[in-house]
């Protein structure tokens, strides 16, 4: 890392800034790595389980919340931080399917990845509707019609889901 800006970038955002004019900043070859500049397989997260593993395009850390993966280089992903709604939604759906002995087959996986559930709506919509029904005018704006639309919404992002565009603007 470079002094000054590099130190600041690392402290603020864990972004490494290297001085490309110095050979000490060249990528090094790690033991076990095929070429220099990459990590060896032993430095990468791997999880083999009988229940499930997942990839939600988020950090490897909670591929399965029952067995968090920890201790890897920060460049691979973060640990101990809040997961994105997409990840949380996926993990909730997996747990719901597996509860009571449910399994995944091709049809269930296809349904799982195309069901268009809006997890933020699942978490927040009931309280939002209760609030706007009790307060149909907010800051001088009548929200009664919007509230009715949200109350009838199926909490999905399907093309015919009337409440979805409105929810995205809330």
Positions of PLM-derived features:
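Long, compositionally biased non-active-site segments enriched in small/hydrophobic residues and glycine
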Residues: 2-170
């Amino acid at each position: 890392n470079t002094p000054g800006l590099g130190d600041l970038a690392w402290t603020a955002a864990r972004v490494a800034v290297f001085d490309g004019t110095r050979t000490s900043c060249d990528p090094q070859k790690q033991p076990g790595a095929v070429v220099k500049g990459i990590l060896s397989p032993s430095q990468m997260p791997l999880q083999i389980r009988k229940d499930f593993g997942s990839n939600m395009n988020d950090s490897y850390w909670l591929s399965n919340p029952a067995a968090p993966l920890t201790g890897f280089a920060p460049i691979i992903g973060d640990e101990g931080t809040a997961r994105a709604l997409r990840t949380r939604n996926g993990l909730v759906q997996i747990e719901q399917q597996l509860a009571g002995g449910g399994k995944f087959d091709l049809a269930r996986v296809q349904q799982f990845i195309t069901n268009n559930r809006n997890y933020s709506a699942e978490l927040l919509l009931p309280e939002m509707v209760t609030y706007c029904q009790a307060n149909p005018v907010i800051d001088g704006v009548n929200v009664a019609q919007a509230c009715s639309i949200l109350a009838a919404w199926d909490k999905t992002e399907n093309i015919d889901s009337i409440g979805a565009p409105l929810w995205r603007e809330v």
